[in-house]
């Protein structure tokens, strides 16, 4: 099967590796010096926890032409970069697209593609891995990499059997995890990571400086957001998040605090925040807009606002001239 991974950051490279290992003909869309490295050395990934290095000889392109047909396209880009590539995806003849990664405007992205090409199948995904990119390799952090994948909402528009089978064939059936409501999943993921993002910004991307009390506050902030979601009728996804809210996320603070104190916290959180602050603030802005639209909700965001205010203040201090997103 011909698979294109559109975007060659850490997640895109790890996803391309999975597709390659599944026996597909894999192409990576990359640009600049990194594209040169991929052509010269292949896709080199250091799997940190597994203490092994893999090299995959993938194809490399620098742009996607309308006539370049692939059985599956995975778009793996920062949320702020996705809108610019939607016209290219809509104009391309490939029949299936999966948008992978943070996306608080998933519905609008899908609609733009379908307005231009109603026959195209669109799904959404989130890839469970992290890491950073060095000059000639990727350092990846994962236990058992999974692509959480599905439609925005299966109740209104389920994923077709053909689309699901193609995704599973692309990455390997064992690496796919079905999700029936990716819109809710992505919204829940955003509010689970934003408090961590705020702590990263407040402590200059050094999570080892985070106190145990702040760790507990981060979880409490997520619970505040979850309560609003529940009242708005937004499902808490994935499975287990309803129970986590009912238990006030008890039992999670200590393991999370331990992660903050190790290199794992840097690879799964700090690195991404430092490399993509624009995407993090875009997530923040999207959530603040969602909060503002929930006019009848009167629940507390005391802890959330405390963490966010500290992050805004420190980021503004470190970046003179920066303006905080709407809602500050």
What is each PLM-predicted segment?
Residues 1-51:
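NAD(P)+-binding Rossmann beta1-loop-alpha1 motif at the extreme N-terminus of oxidoreductases
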Residues 3, 25-26, 97, 122, ...:
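Hydrophobic anchor at the start of a short beta-strand
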Residues 105-189:
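Rossmann-fold dinucleotide-binding core
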Residues 29-31, 46-48, 61-63, 125-127, ...:
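Conserved beta-strand termini and adjacent loop/short-helix elements that scaffold enzyme active sites
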Residues 219, 226, 230-328:
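NAD(P)-dependent Rossmann-like dehydrogenase/reductase catalytic/cofactor-binding core
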Residues 52-139:
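Rossmann-like NAD(P)(H) cofactor-binding subdomain of soluble oxidoreductases
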Residues 181-226:
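Active-site-proximal catalytic alpha-helix in oxidoreductases
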Residues 138-148, 200-210, 263-274:
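Helix-loop-beta segment of a Rossmann-like dinucleotide-binding subdomain
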